[in-house]
Amino acid sequence: MPPFYYRRRWYSNPWRRKRLRFRRRRLRRPIRKRFRRRRWVRRRRFFRFKRKLRKIRIDQWQPETIRKCHVKGNLCLLTCGRGNINHNYILTSESYVPTSEPGGGSWSILQMTTRVLYDEYKAARNWWTKSNSLLPLTKYIRCKLKFYRSDQTDYIVTIQRTGPFEVTLESYLSTQPSRHLMNHKAFIVPKLGRGPNKETYVKKIVRPPALFQSKWYFSQDIYNTPLFILTVSSCSLDQMYAPQDQISTNISLFSLNTNVFQINNWHKQPYTTKAASTLETYLYCYHNGHEPTQELKWKDIILLGNMTNYTDGKKYNTSGTTPLDLFKTENKPYWGNVFTNLNQDQDVIIYYGTKPKQDDNWTSTAPILPITSLYVECRYNPFKDKGTGNKVYLVPTDSGLGSFLTLPTKSELIITDLPLWLITWGWIEWLKKSRPVAHIEEEYQVVIQSKYIHPQLPCYVLIDKYFRHPPEGQHYITELSETDKLHWHPKYSMQTEQLELIAETGPAAPKINNTKQIEAHLNYDFLFKWGGSPAPMETITDPAEQEKFPSPSNQLQGLQIESPGKPKQYYLYTFDEKRSELTMPAAKRLKKDFTTPTFFTDFGTKDIPLKTQEETDQISEDEEIETSLPKEDHLKQQLQRTRQYYREGIRKLLKTKKLFPL
């Protein structure tokens, strides 16, 4: 048998092998040695080279002190009054609502951060089970959410844990209930009464964000970092397309007669209705029950050229003047506004015409004609609206020489090729958020160009009932605000009711017809770990100097909660203390001023910042030291840096070791 056929044996355990007794062999007569195959086998040794690991494990040492903290509280997701469904609740949650006007909104996009939780704690709306005082490190574990079922409405929720944590126009339009239902990550919280034996809440567990690592962060560094984003939209699943209190899915809209009113600048003095390229046309009226069959004399005329103030106008003093004097700016107190209650009365006829001629006197006949109507009643069918060719844009009310058909030059002020019920849902709210222009409510008006509204007009400037039927007589003194008295003309604040009617016709839009207000809320339970190395001098106090409380001895003192955005340089650590005294570097650090990076937003901490908004740059310590030092010390430091730079350059050229300083 060849040697390479020898069978290898398993290595036995030498510690368990039975050791044989040593015996000496006796001497024998030498004979021819016969062949015996060897029992031992050569051990093959393989040389193995250690390969590079595909991944490495990075460990982080735990802080000396760790406390588990639960942050528990309730959070309002949305509140919406009847007639305000196309608004974002978060943008107006901290605003004052005028008397007898709806507030809130039927949808919201909000973020949850440690800054939000601390603000809620200061407002006494949540509770922290453990104090984070002197513990600058934070580790976010998870959050338990309970979405309670509302008694008035169903609502849809989407939880976002991955970035980017920003909002865009598409984010606002996606809150429309029919589009929100198409999100595969969305879930529905049905209202009470759907399944009487079901739980009264929907429970969800939210893990940390996708890019978070299982490590300790400084609380200041994640102060503004969103833990997750909630998108909430109320909806009507039982009135998906048709409201119960209406007999049709079509709605009636009232638009300004844009065949008569063509110029959008209401601050023009006196106001002309036609475009600048045509002959200037003015508006006139007669009071005191003037009959249309009578002759129209300039002496009885009232010029309706003041479209800013709420005034009816009055007759001009004809002694020693001509009709052309009425158009001078100093005679503005005699001008009237066509949109007052008196001038919009059915018995008052509004006329349009040109200026009087140079040779006309007060007894001359005025060449003016009556207009058909100030407003046009229109009908809108949401099922007919395909979105093709629709244009909705903003035009200013106090500037420009163009007409309502003039499109804005800014692309942010126009939106096209979408259904009107979708545009009116979130586009205006996006403009309030992104702010391409300021003072939208008072200085801009919404213009619609669409072929899905009947009858056809060049464009539509929708007007609310409050503007079409203003307070009568002296009642306007108390009912109108000072802003309305000085800016009584079509503007966005006088169009919100009509735009809300269009938004309500959208699929699954909430129908608030059985109550005056709807609301939705949740209960949250955040789990954090606070960590740090608090200095001993902060925990030891002389017993003789302890404060004595007049309350009973069994009453516990409240926890001391610090803002998570407190700069980490203000904390005292174990290495800051030596022999029960504060070290010099610690004292120098505490004397400096540090700031916490924040986001600039005017809508509260729950509102999500825009994509263009960035964190405020924090000044580095080196720059602070340089600015605080005198000029001479600053020059010395600069000289020392330059000297060190040249030393390094010389070492690289010589390519020698650093054996002695240069």
Swiss-Prot record:
List localization entries.
Answer: Virion
Q: Which organism is it from?
A: Torque teno mini virus 1 (isolate TLMV-CBD279)
What is the protein's known function? Self-assembles to form an icosahedral capsid with a T=1 symmetry, about 30 nm in diameter, and consisting of 60 capsid proteins. The capsid encapsulates the genomic DNA. Capsid protein is involved in attachment and entry into the host cell.
Q: A GO CC term?
A: T=1 icosahedral viral capsid
Q: Which family does it belong to?
A: Belongs to the anelloviridae capsid protein family.
Q: Which UniProt keywords apply?
A: Capsid protein, T=1 icosahedral capsid protein, Virion
The answer, when asked if Transcription is one of the entry's keywords, is: no
Q: What is this protein called?
A: Capsid protein
Keyword Lyase listed: no
Q: What is its main location?
A: virion
Which residues are the signal sequence here? none
UniProt xrefs under InterPro entries: TTvirus_Unk (IPR004219)
